[in-house]
């Protein structure tokens, strides 16, 4: 079997690229607003740090490669990479983590391969996975949504936490993660996985404050719905195609429904999978990256379905509570194979 892969770059029209990237940035506003509302100012500060780091790192590498800095920065791809990484990490993560992750994403995962259009893996997810593997404690230290938080830091305390690790009164992350029940909180997916391992039943877990009166976790369901709104905007503007997000979400829902049907005492419900974690962010903003996703319609359906299966498997049986980043990167590996078998036949040419 011989793979015939068109030569890179795969993104040719800079004006079209800039327009798409700008639309994605605009579409991210509802998700950013929701995360800021439920988890505080840290989301915005992380975005600013990531954006500055992405632009500086991109400019330095472009200068070293003797390429035009201004024209490349105007495609907004560096900003988008920084944004996607920033909204994926905890809002109060130390400043150096977002700088390190964004720098790695731009320099190693993007520019080392030749820049936009030539990277085989999603740069933001490469940066995220590097941080998650290297600093698992910090990367899983999410604040509880303000509705169930015992203490909510203001803007200045948020800055102090990001740059020094303490609030003005001496509080630290351990204190800020305590909920109204006096117990340290985690994300709905993390809570579900760790509680099951501790021997708690699903019925007991669903009584925790993080799930109180919510389909998929207080705050998180609204965050996911906000990213869904942005995704619908992208579909309306034809900035992305429907194949990947639809196949991803349907496959994830199907796997979750079957698992829940046969083992409701140990596996999460479909609504928890669909409306918690990075599900909608991944479906519409990460998996749809035109550079690292499949390029044919049939291939996009397969690519999205594969990612959906992987997310469910990692969440249900893996060591990490979410799994979207790992699923994206594993699916990226299969793109050349998927495209090889799904590329339409060109009539008038015989197979070599």
From Swiss-Prot:
<dbReference type="Pfam" id="PF03116">
    <property type="entry name" value="NQR2_RnfD_RnfE"/>
</dbReference>
<feature type="transmembrane region" description="Helical">
    <location>
        <begin position="123"/>
        <end position="143"/>
    </location>
</feature>
<comment type="function">
    <text>Part of a membrane-bound complex that couples electron transfer with translocation of ions across the membrane. Required to maintain the reduced state of SoxR.</text>
</comment>
<keyword id="KW-1003">Cell membrane</keyword>
<keyword id="KW-0472">Membrane</keyword>
<keyword id="KW-0812">Transmembrane</keyword>
<keyword id="KW-0285">Flavoprotein</keyword>
<keyword id="KW-0288">FMN</keyword>
<keyword id="KW-0813">Transport</keyword>
<keyword id="KW-0597">Phosphoprotein</keyword>
<dbReference type="InterPro" id="IPR011303">
    <property type="entry name" value="RnfD_bac"/>
</dbReference>
<feature type="transmembrane region" description="Helical">
    <location>
        <begin position="242"/>
        <end position="262"/>
    </location>
</feature>
<keyword id="KW-1133">Transmembrane helix</keyword>
<comment type="subunit">
    <text>The complex is composed of six subunits: RsxA, RsxB, RsxC, RsxD, RsxE and RsxG.</text>
</comment>
<protein>
    <recommendedName>
        <fullName>Ion-translocating oxidoreductase complex subunit D</fullName>
        <ecNumber>7.-.-.-</ecNumber>
    </recommendedName>
</protein>
<keyword id="KW-0997">Cell inner membrane</keyword>
<feature type="transmembrane region" description="Helical">
    <location>
        <begin position="301"/>
        <end position="321"/>
    </location>
</feature>
<feature type="transmembrane region" description="Helical">
    <location>
        <begin position="69"/>
        <end position="91"/>
    </location>
</feature>
<dbReference type="GO" id="GO:0055085">
    <property type="term" value="P:transmembrane transport"/>
</dbReference>
<feature type="modified residue" description="FMN phosphoryl threonine">
    <location>
        <position position="187"/>
    </location>
</feature>
<keyword id="KW-1278">Translocase</keyword>
<feature type="transmembrane region" description="Helical">
    <location>
        <begin position="322"/>
        <end position="342"/>
    </location>
</feature>
<feature type="transmembrane region" description="Helical">
    <location>
        <begin position="20"/>
        <end position="40"/>
    </location>
</feature>
<feature type="transmembrane region" description="Helical">
    <location>
        <begin position="267"/>
        <end position="287"/>
    </location>
</feature>
<comment type="similarity">
    <text>Belongs to the NqrB/RnfD family.</text>
</comment>
<keyword id="KW-0249">Electron transport</keyword>
<feature type="transmembrane region" description="Helical">
    <location>
        <begin position="42"/>
        <end position="62"/>
    </location>
</feature>
<dbReference type="GO" id="GO:0022900">
    <property type="term" value="P:electron transport chain"/>
</dbReference>
<dbReference type="InterPro" id="IPR004338">
    <property type="entry name" value="NqrB/RnfD"/>
</dbReference>
<feature type="transmembrane region" description="Helical">
    <location>
        <begin position="215"/>
        <end position="235"/>
    </location>
</feature>
<dbReference type="GO" id="GO:0005886">
    <property type="term" value="C:plasma membrane"/>
</dbReference>
């Amino acid at each position: 079997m011989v793979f015939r892969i068109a030569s890179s770059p795969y993104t040719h029209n800079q004006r079209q690229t800039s327009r798409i990237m700008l639309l994605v940035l605009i579409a991210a506003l509802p998700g950013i607003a929701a995360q800021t509302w439920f988890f505080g100012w840290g989301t915005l500060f992380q975005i600013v740090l990531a954006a500055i780091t992405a632009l500086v790192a991109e400019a330095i590498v472009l200068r070293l490669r003797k390429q035009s800095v201004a024209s490349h920065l105007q495609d907004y791809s560096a900003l988008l990479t920084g944004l996607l990484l920033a909204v994926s990490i905890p809002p109060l993560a130390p400043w150096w983590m977002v700088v390190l992750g964004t720098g790695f994403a731009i320099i190693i995962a993007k520019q080392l391969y030749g820049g936009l259009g030539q990277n085989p893996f999603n740069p933001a997810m490469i940066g995220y996975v590097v941080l998650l593997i290297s600093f698992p404690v910090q990367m899983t230290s999410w604040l509880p949504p303000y509705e169930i938080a015992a203490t909510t830091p203001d803007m200045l305390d948020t800055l102090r936490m990001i740059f020094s690790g303490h609030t003005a009164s001496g509080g630290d992350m351990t204190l800020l993660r305590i909920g109204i029940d006096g117990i340290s909180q985690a994300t709905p997916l993390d809570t579900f996985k760790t509680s099951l391992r501790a021997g708690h039943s699903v019925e007991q877990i669903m009584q925790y404050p993080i799930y109180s009166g919510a389909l998929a976790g207080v705050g998180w369901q609204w965050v996911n719905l906000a990213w869904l709104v942005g995704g619908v905007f992208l579909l309306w503007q034809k900035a992305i195609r429907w194949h990947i997000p639809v196949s991803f979400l349907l496959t994830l829902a199907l796997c979750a429904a079957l698992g829940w049907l046969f083992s409701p005492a140990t596996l999460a419900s479909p609504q928890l999978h669909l409306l918690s974690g990075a599900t909608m962010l991944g479906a519409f903003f990460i998996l749809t990256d035109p550079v690292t996703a499949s390029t044919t319609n049939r291939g996009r359906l397969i690519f999205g379905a594969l990612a959906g299966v992987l997310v469910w498997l990692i969440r249900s049986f893996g060591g990490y509570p979410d799994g979207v980043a790992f699923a994206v990167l594993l699916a990226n590996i299969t793109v050349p194979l998927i495209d090889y078998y799904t590329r339409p036949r060109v009539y008038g040419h015989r197979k070599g």
